């Protein structure tokens, strides 16, 4: 049987559907965050906006309660970037990504972190500052910080240390972010990598092996043995695409409503699918600073800002009258929610 070929527009609609951007849904926060494989969260506020644009009736207090209950966690995961995920996924994804430590993390730092991880989880059961954790490491294990981020970064990965809830609350002033260990079930490394691949495809697919690697930070060889049971498809260029069976593949003409995305939203990572090349430099600035954007008919069409109680939009090109009205209506709803 010939492999199905998907057009660029069909791939666009597939990703939007899986990222809950074709229609808002009613889901508990933890389930929603798991459904979309987490949210980038360099800024504590961005997951709140990302969930508002995806969930019907979302209120900031809902996510705050999940943070305080420690059913979600905000910490370093894919590509060494801060993400908000469920606490269960924090352990699963962290185990899968142990093979993907940045090259600047030395083997010595990784070994130190492995030795200290178990006792650090207990020490960080209540919030600790970075200084407290490094002082503890020297006091309990006789290991002084080397003056770089190597040991600190390795500790956060190995011990599953995340930002404490108070560092991630809506509009909360943060003075000296603190960190806390995340309870999780131990998972075998290869099984964790296979599950991470499937979770990515369910949230962003179909995708190439290179796209899986680009999102996760793993190398293709790290998950090459974890691809059994996946569906094979092709894009218009003939590239092989992987997907989980029975995942949604909406028709190319499926309506895509106007949606506002926060800075660094995950859906922009595969820029070709949602972000037109001619607008890339307007959205992705120096130092990979990704601007808050809005999408019209499934594609990024401009950037937005919020000031003095109002959302201001800057389209990259003139919009059709109907799209402009829809954009204004959605901007009004976002402004009312942000006030």
Regions found by a protein language model. Give the residues of each.
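Long, low-complexity intrinsically disordered regions
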Residues: 1-274, 279-339
């Amino acid at each position: 049987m010939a492999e199905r070929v998907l057009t660029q527009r069909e791939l666009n609609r597939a990703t939007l559907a899986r990222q809950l951007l074709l229609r808002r849904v009613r889901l508990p926060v933890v389930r929603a965050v798991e459904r979309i494989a987490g949210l980038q969260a360099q800024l504590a506020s961005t997951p709140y906006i990302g969930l508002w644009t995806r969930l019907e009736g979302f209120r900031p207090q809902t996510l705050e309660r999940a943070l305080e209950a420690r059913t979600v966690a905000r910490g370093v995961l894919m590509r060494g970037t801060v993400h908000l995920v469920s606490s269960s996924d924090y352990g699963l994804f962290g185990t899968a990504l142990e093979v993907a430590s940045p090259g600047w993390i030395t083997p010595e730092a990784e070994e130190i972190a492995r030795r200290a991880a178990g006792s650090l989880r207990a020490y960080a059961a209540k919030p600790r500052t970075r200084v407290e954790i490094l002082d503890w490491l020297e006091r309990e294990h006789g290991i002084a910080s080397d003056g770089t981020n190597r040991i600190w970064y390795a500790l956060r990965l190995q011990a599953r240390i995340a930002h404490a809830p108070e560092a991630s609350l809506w509009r909360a002033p943060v003075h000296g972010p603190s960190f806390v260990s995340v309870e999780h079930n131990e998972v075998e490394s290869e099984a964790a990598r296979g599950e991470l691949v499937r979770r990515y495809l369910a949230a962003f697919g179909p995708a190439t092996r290179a796209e899986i690697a680009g999102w996760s930070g793993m190398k293709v060889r790290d998950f090459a043995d974890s691809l059994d049971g996946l569906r094979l498809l092709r894009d218009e260029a003939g590239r092989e695409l992987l997907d989980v069976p029975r995942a949604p593949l909406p028709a190319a003409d499926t309506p895509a409503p106007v949606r506002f995305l926060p800075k660094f939203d995950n859906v922009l990572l595969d820029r070709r699918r949602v972000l037109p090349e001619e607008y890339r430099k307007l959205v992705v600035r120096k130092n990979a600073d990704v601007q808050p954007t809005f999408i019209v008919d499934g594609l990024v069409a401009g950037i937005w800002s919020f000031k003095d109680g109002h959302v201001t939009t800057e389209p990259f090109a003139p919009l059709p009258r109907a799209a402009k009205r829809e954009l204004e209506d959605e901007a009004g709803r976002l402004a009312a929610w942000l006030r």
